[in-house]
Amino acid sequence: ATAQEQPEGEAPDKVESPVVXXXEAXIVLVNYAREADVDAMMKDAVDYWGQIDVIANNAGITVIALNLTGVFLCSQAATKIMMKKRKGRIINIASVVGLIGNIGQANYAAAKAGVIGFSKTAAREGASRNINVNVVCPGFIASEMTAKLGEDMEKKILGTIPLGRYGQPEDVAGLVEFLALSPAASYITGQTFTIDGGIAI
């Protein structure tokens, strides 16, 4: 299931996934910061598919409400379901800013650092039920937002990245796919993975 934040009353025409090209997807409009909405979303997913194997929390914009509260509520609701079958994987998307900070982004850095701390605790709590919890911290990823940056700002940003370029959405998706689905990731939990071109070196 794909849950996306959209203006009220609107829904995307389609869901594009760089990870699983032929997978079935359902679109759900939900307020991640409202516990009742999250619980209803999880119930709908279980009713439709029968279980929840993996969740990847990747919501943002409203800094604390979505970046931290939303991650907590979605992880909590999914864990209750995963505990019954003693298996599951949770991948929370934070940011390299949550590790190293950034001028003018105190609230964002605090929220993302909170996601990292929460995930480590959730990993300890879920381990006895075979629930893996990990964090992915992207750096600057090519997006509509970076496309709007001026030439001077882009040059300044690229100067902070040892690899000298933006990451691509597929870079992040590939790491999330590995953590979510690969048998080789079954012994990985409580870890924070940077995918940032070397910013946090």
UniProtKB/Swiss-Prot annotation:
List of residues binding substrate: 95
Lineage, top ranks: Eukaryota, Viridiplantae, Streptophyta, Embryophyta, Tracheophyta
Enzyme class: oxidoreductase
Primary subcellular site in the record, as a coarse category: plastid
A GO molecular function held by the record: 3-oxoacyl-[acyl-carrier-protein] reductase (NADPH) activity
Active site, UniProt feature: 108
Descriptive protein name: 3-oxoacyl-[acyl-carrier-protein] reductase
Enzyme Commission (EC) number: 1.1.1.100
Family: Belongs to the short-chain dehydrogenases/reductases (SDR) family.
Keyword list, A-Z: Chloroplast, Fatty acid biosynthesis, Fatty acid metabolism, Lipid biosynthesis, Lipid metabolism, NADP, Oxidoreductase, Plastid
Cellular component aspect of the GO annotation: chloroplast
Note from the entry: Exhibits a marked preference for acyl-carrier protein derivatives over CoA derivatives as substrates.
Tissue occurrence: Embryo and leaf tissues.
